Amino acid sequence: MSSSGPPAGDGRDDASGPGPAGAAAAADGSVPVSRSIVERWKMEPAAARARLLLRAVAWLFSLLALVVMASNKHGHGGAQDFDNYPEYTYCLGISIIAVLYTTAQVTRDVHRLSWGRDVIAGRKAAAVVDFAGDQVVAYLLMSALSAAAPVTDYMRQAADNLFTDSAAAAISMAFLAFLAAGLSALVSGYNLAMEVLV
């Protein structure tokens, strides 16, 4: 009777089995960082990848809204300076909050992808933080653009100039950031539901 063990050199190409990759990993005791990140990205659930991309998009548009609104100063005795309008100042403040939040969340997602562990210990706690944070930021962005849009529309009826165009552009960027944050909140809600059910 012959033993029925796995055939030697079965061609598996992973870090734990035979093959060139296994030999390379065994030589120095580690897997190359670039390969490790790519493998973790492929193993991440589609929802987690979608959330990372949506947060990156929200970060980009929040940053654009912040920059455009902060630079919206065109003189004329202060009539065309954003900081003379509380609605625009509020929109700028919310854009700053959105940039800080999405920066922290994207950094956290990249850390999890790179190192294979989350900075928040409990999975359910992390899911609650994701869902609550995305919901709050999406609501704040919507409230900011809802406050600034009527003022811009009223001023554009009297005069359509660079100041009102810049304000409209910043509001549009905030709206796109809201859409991305809202979709990210939906994904976070799905992840939270899965954690609670499982």
UniProtKB/Swiss-Prot annotation:
Localisation: Cell membrane
Cytoplasmic side: 1-51, 107-124, 188-198
Signal peptide: none
Segments on the Extracellular side according to the record's topology features: 73-85, 146-166
Membrane topology: Multi-pass membrane protein
Keyword tags: Cell membrane, Membrane, Transmembrane, Transmembrane helix
InterPro entries: CASP_dom
Residue intervals passing through the bilayer: 52-72, 86-106, 125-145, 167-187
Highest taxon in the source lineage: Eukaryota
Pfam families from the UniProt entry: CASP_dom
Residue span of region Disordered: 1-27
GO cellular component terms, semicolon-separated: plasma membrane
Biased composition (Low complexity): 16-27
Ranges in coiled-coil conformation: none
Family label: Belongs to the Casparian strip membrane proteins (CASP) family.
Subunit organization: Homodimer and heterodimers.
Protein name: CASP-like protein 4B3
Annotated organism of origin: Oryza sativa subsp. japonica (Rice)
